[in-house]
Design a protein with these regions (language model features):
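Hydrophobic alpha-helical transmembrane bundles of multi-pass membrane proteins
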Residues: 3-12, 16-226
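Single conserved hydrophobic/aromatic residue that forms the stacking wall/gate
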Residues: 225, 231-234
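Generic cytosolic/nucleocytoplasmic N-terminal low-complexity/intrinsically disordered segments
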Residues: 1-4, 230-232
């Protein structure tokens, strides 16, 4: 229902007569709409299936709920202050507060050749999938409540500054750093975060020597087939 409401807002905005201007490119808009859906699809059900298939049977629901919870938590963060800190303001490390609660978002707002509302949701999908990728590093070893706290802190202290510095007009962007597909903002940040989390938590109970066989390999492999079209966006 939440995803449906977001999509409804986007399409209502796109159909507004005020957007029928030279600034908005219909081809760019259609493609970014498609890319937005595909990136979200990589997280739910993509990553949920992948990590769920690799853990033991007794932990599958825990991993699935972590992926779903991250999607919900980051979506709320993005609307309240995430987009504002990532894409507004002239700070070199972090953005400003001009768009808290998306207060600056108008029906006629544009970001390049796209409606700004679409740009907000597109960038939100990357903010969602990045901490979700870290789940694999602490699977079966972190409580749900701890994961929620970790997600809020990690997105706020790591992802948002990195996003602003590269994509939001911050320091790295000003010195010529280019990241078209998220190699730095997404993959580098979540990779380092996953490494630190794994080192802090240590190995799973029973490793080595215990039975840690994935409970459903076909379920994990299905993620690869489901997301092959998605990889085309990069």
């Amino acid at each position: 229902m939440k995803l449906f409401n977001i999509c409804l807002v986007i399409f209502t905005t796109l159909l507004s007569p005020t957007l029928l201007s030279a600034e908005i490119n219909s081809g760019d808009t259609a493609w970014i709409l498609t890319a937005t859906a595909l990136v979200l699809f990589m997280t739910l059900p993509g990553l949920a299936l992948f990590y769920g298939g690799l853990v033991r049977n007794q932990n599958i629901l825990s991993v699935l709920m972590q992926c779903f919870a991250i999607c919900c938590i980051v979506s709320v963060i993005w609307v309240i202050y995430g987009y504002s800190l990532a894409f507004t303001g002239a700070g070199s490390i972090i953005g400003g507060t001009d768009a808290l609660f998306l207060s600056s978002l108008m029906r006629e707002s544009a970001s390049g050749t796209l409606p700004e509302s679409l740009f907000v949701v597109f960038q939100m999908t990357f903010a969602v999938i990045t901490p979700a990728l870290v789940v694999g590093a602490f699977a079966e070893r972190m409580k749900f409540s701890a994961m929620c706290i970790f997600t809020v802190l990690w997105v706020t202290l790591v992802y948002l500054p990195a996003c602003h510095m590269v994509w939001g007009g911050g320091y790295l962007g000003s010195i010529g750093v280019i990241d078209f597909a998220g190699g730095l903002v997404v993959h580098a940040t979540c990779g380092i975060g996953a490494l630190v989390a794994a080192m802090m938590l240590g190995p799973r109970k029973g490793f080595p020597g215990g039975s840690l066989v994935p409970h459903n390999r076909p379920m994990a492999v299905s993620y690869t087939h489901l997301t092959l079209p998605t990889k085309r966006i990069v």
